[in-house]
Amino acid sequence: VVSAGLIAGDFVTVLQALPRSEHQVVAVAARDLRRAEEFARTHGIPKAYGSYEELAKDPDVEVAYIGTQHPQHKAAVLLFLAAGKAVLCEKPLGVNAAEVREMVAEARSRGLFLMEAIWTRCFPAVDALKSLLAQGALGDLRVARAEFGENLTQVLRSVDWAQAGGGLLDLGIYCVQFISMVFGGQKPEKISAVGRRYETGVDDTVTVLLQYPGGVHGSFTCSISSKLSNTCSVSGTKGIAQLLEPCWCPTELVVNKERKEFPLAPEENKKFNYRNGMGMSYEAQHVRDCLRKGLKESPVIPLAESQLLADILEEVRKAIGVTFPQDKH
């Protein structure tokens, strides 16, 4: 586990609730040894390291889970790939398209597994939606819509320009991945966007229109200063399907007013930092399945689609005039 932050804490809590014969957390690394040791004590992890390099050298580590801040993803991914490890990296995989391309090229050249942790795609409610679409239950598709907004202006990371904060990379990626998923991972023909910037220079609230081949389109809004409906929907000539709030970790799917529930495993006495934390188990099990099959990437979140999502988000940022220090000008 690379990082001793909040999301890493949730992931470890989930892994330890799964069978030990299938998942074992062998070590954690942070850039501050004290934090790593404290995290290891809290979660009962045998080894703690004060640098990522030491963790990369640990022969007991088969898979590295990277839960650092956005701008640290690339260096960490490249470090663990160079050490011959499989890598599951939190979204967004990179701050921009160039970073993502570099990581994907490295994984492919080394023949190692790399996956962007878009956990939403591993949820049973999303599987059910994909099945419906595959069966043509909604008829010919016409439009998809997604919204994700929370007031995160008190969360330092969310408004920090140097850390590539803002809504698009943190929340917008969930919206884009939904629209991309329902339209089969195609490249949009046209992207337009409007938005406002926060006083620190990150994007605050953004609305995006995506025109796809075949006359279908999608739109999404993401915001770090206002609460939105946090739902996703797709409509066709025979009806509408909606993932209810929280659509980034959904447990309810409504198809033409018929509601289906996909409850999570009970949390019992576990403490999570984020909503529906138990849902990270779907992602963990998916990575295990991929590795057992000898796959180098996930069929659910293929690397080509991670590249496409990064391309779209970068184009949106250009349209609204948001650049980060990690962007090459």
From Swiss-Prot:
InterPro entries: Gfo/Idh/MocA-like_OxRdtase_N, Gfo/Idh/MocA_domain, GFO_IDH_MocA-like_dom, NAD(P)-bd_dom_sf. GO terms for molecular function: D-xylose 1-dehydrogenase (NADP+) activity; nucleotide binding; trans-1,2-dihydrobenzene-1,2-diol dehydrogenase activity. The keyword Nucleotide-binding does not apply. Stimulated by various salts. The record marks 174 as: May play an important role in catalytic activity. Lens, liver and small intestine. Keywords: NADP, Oxidoreductase. Pfam families: GFO_IDH_MocA (PF01408), GFO_IDH_MocA_C3 (PF22725). The record marks 170 as: May play an important role for the adaptation of the alcohol substrate into the binding site. It catalyses: (1R,2R)-1,2-dihydrobenzene-1,2-diol + NADP(+) = catechol + NADPH + H(+); D-xylose + NADP(+) = D-xylono-1,5-lactone + NADPH + H(+). The record marks 65, 73, 91 as: May play an important role in coenzyme binding. GO terms for biological process: D-xylose catabolic process. Its EC number is 1.3.1.20, 1.1.1.179. Belongs to the Gfo/Idh/MocA family. Homodimer. This is Trans-1,2-dihydrobenzene-1,2-diol dehydrogenase. The gene is DHDH.
